[in-house]
Amino acid sequence: MVGPEIERLIQLLSRLPGLGPRSARRAALRLVEKRESLLVPLAQAMADAAARVRTCSVCGNFDTIDPCAICADHRRDPSMLCVVEDVAGLWAMERTGSFKGRYAVLGGLLSALDGVGPEDLGIESLVARALDPAITEIILATPATVEGQTTAHYVAERLAPCNVTVSGLAHGVPVGGELDHLDDGTITAALRARRVF
C-alpha cells in the first residue's frame, strides 16, 4: 500500500499516452527513488511549462513566445504552409528537418461520430491565411485515416477558391518497408501513388 501522494502521482501518470497503471507505477517508483535527480527537476520543468507555454496565435503550435519560434523565423519559406491535425503532427514534421515552410494546426479532425465539425477546427483561420498572396502552396499532412482523409478533402474544397496549390503527403510503402509486412490499404495506396523511375 502506498500513501495518497504517491497514489495520486501514479493516477496522474497513468493518464499519459502510452502509460497504463503498471507503467505509471514503475515510473512513479523511479521518480520517488531518484527524487533529487528526477522528481524535483521534473516537477520544476512541469511548473515552468504550465506557467509559460502558450498556443501560438498564428499556427497553433506550443511555445513560450507568441508567435512561436517557427512563425517568427524569417528564414522559413513563407510560400509554403503545411496543415497538420495537431501539434504532435507539427513536431513530427519538424523532426524530419525536411520541411522549411510554416504550419497551420487544425486542432483535430472532422468526425461525425465524435461530434467534431468544421466549426470546431481551425479551418476558418487557415482559409484566411490562404488568402495571403505570399502563400502559394498548402500541403495537407493529415493522417491516412478515414477522418484524416475526410478532413483533407473538406479543407481542399474550402481552399479551392483561394489562389494556392493544394497538395497532400504521399501514402504508401515506408522506407525500409517490406511488402509482406504491410496491410492491404497501404499497398493499395502505394500502388496508386507510384512514380516513374
Swiss-Prot record:
It holds the Pfam family RecR_HhH. The keyword Zinc applies. Gene3D superfamilies: 3.40.1360.10, RecR Domain 1. A zinc finger (C4-type) spans 56-71. GO terms for molecular function: DNA binding; zinc ion binding. Residues 79-174 form the Toprim domain. InterPro entries: DNA_Rcmb_RecR (IPR000093), Rcmb_RecR (IPR023627), Rcmb_RecR_Znf (IPR015967), TOPRIM_dom (IPR006171), TOPRIM_RecR (IPR034137). Keywords: DNA damage, DNA recombination, DNA repair, Metal-binding, Zinc, Zinc-finger. It comes from the Bacteria. GO terms for biological process: DNA recombination; DNA repair. May play a role in DNA repair. It seems to be involved in an RecBC-independent recombinational process of DNA repair. It may act with RecF and RecO. NCBIfam families: recR. This is Recombination protein RecR. It comes from Paramagnetospirillum magneticum (strain ATCC 700264 / AMB-1) (Magnetospirillum magneticum). The lineage of its organism: Bacteria, Pseudomonadati, Pseudomonadota, Alphaproteobacteria, Rhodospirillales.
